[in-house]
Amino acid sequence: MIYTDFKGEKISQLGFGTMRLPVINGVDKDIDEEKALEMFDYAYKHGINYFDTAWGYHEGNSEIVVGKALSRYPRESFHLTTKFPGYDRNNFPKVKEIFAKQLEKLQTEYFDFYLFHNVCEYNIENYLNPEFGVKEYLVSEREAGRIKHLGFSDHSGIECFKRFLDAYGDVIEFCQIQLNWLDWDFQEAKEKVRNL
């Protein structure tokens, strides 16, 4: 496995994403746990130490299965990523409740990486609304040690991307964007990389 250094942490360059785990009878929420656990074991034994999930993957069940799978390994041996579900504007008033539930579902006391999920034109006003206090709350969780690194995932146009960075750039350590190595114009990836 090839690893990279991120702020003193050894991260596998190949990560394990859990948006599309094996399912039973084609039903997205019904994860085939036996097959999923085999996949986690294979990845872990072959050096993958970066695991990515999110609140909404598999209708909320991805985090549960990821928690079961990773609880079998020493916590310091892997890097766990999940995300605040900003794709649903109804979640903004519930940031504390959601964060606590994610810790429970993932059977962990902290997240190595935590993202503001799917920043886009649809939800940017909620991310920028001080009434919700999402930024302040998640920064406080980082200060308390329950988040090591705070970032965001983006599916917006460049103007929305810049607005988010203007407001959150002082606390952001990393970003996930849609990047197609053969088509750098997809979702304005080239321009986003320039702005990071």
Regions found by a protein language model. Name each.
Residues 1-78, 137, 143:
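N-terminal binding-site loop/beta-alpha segment at the start of enzyme catalytic domains
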Residues 3, 11-15, 49-50, 77-83, ...:
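Structural preference for beta-strand elements that scaffold enzyme active sites
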Residues 1, 40, 63, 67, ...:
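Generic structural signal for well-ordered alpha-helices
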Residues 20-34, 83-93, 122-127, 156:
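Active-site mouth loops of central-metabolism enzymes
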Residues 19-21, 54-56, 83-87, 116-119, ...:
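Active-site beta-loop-alpha junctions enriched in small/polar residues
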Residues 104-126:
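Active-site groove signature of glycoside hydrolases
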Residues 28-43, 91-107, 156-166:
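Short, acidic/polar
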Residues 119-196:
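Beta/alpha (TIM)-barrel catalytic core signal, keyed to glycine-rich beta->alpha loops juxtaposed to Asp/Glu
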